[in-house]
Amino acid sequence: MPTIQQLIRSGRSIKASKTASPALEKCPQKRGVCTRVYTTTPKKPNSALRKVARVRLSNKIEVTAYIPGEGHNLQEHSIVLIRGGRVKDLPGVRYHIVRGSLDTSGVADRKQSRSKYGAKQPKAGAAAPVKGKRR
C-alpha cells in the first residue's frame, strides 16, 4: 500500500484493458489470405475434428481462425474475412471466418440462423422452413 507522499508524487495508475482480439487492431473485420487449411482436435472432454485455417491478415499478422458451419470451400490462397470471437475448446483460436463473404461460400441447405452462415433464403418452391412448433 502506498504512502500519502508516494500518491502525491506519482498518483494511481489506471490499468489498461487488454483486447481479446489484438490482430484486428480495433477494426470490426479484417481481410486475409489462407496459408494453411486443416483440422484439429478440441480440448478434453470434447472430441471432434474442428476445421481451422491459418490466415495472414492484411496487416501482416498471422492468426488461426475457425471455419464455422458444415462443409467449406476454403483452400490455400483463398481470400477470407476475419471477425473476432474465440472457440472455447480450441486453444489459440481467437477469430472466426465470416461465411458468405469474399472467397468463402455460405453453408449449403441451411434453414435456420442463415445470416450467421451466409446462406441465401430458400426458394419459394422448395419446402418452407418450419416457423414454430405446432401442438
From Swiss-Prot:
InterPro entries cross-referenced by the UniProt entry: NA-bd_OB-fold (IPR012340), Ribosomal_uS12 (IPR006032), Ribosomal_uS12_bac (IPR005679)
CDD domains (UniProt xref): Ribosomal_S12
Record bears the keyword DNA-binding: no
GO MF assignments: rRNA binding; structural constituent of ribosome; tRNA binding
Cellular component terms (Gene Ontology): small ribosomal subunit
Main function: With S4 and S5 plays an important role in translational accuracy.
Family: Belongs to the universal ribosomal protein uS12 family.
Protein name: Small ribosomal subunit protein uS12
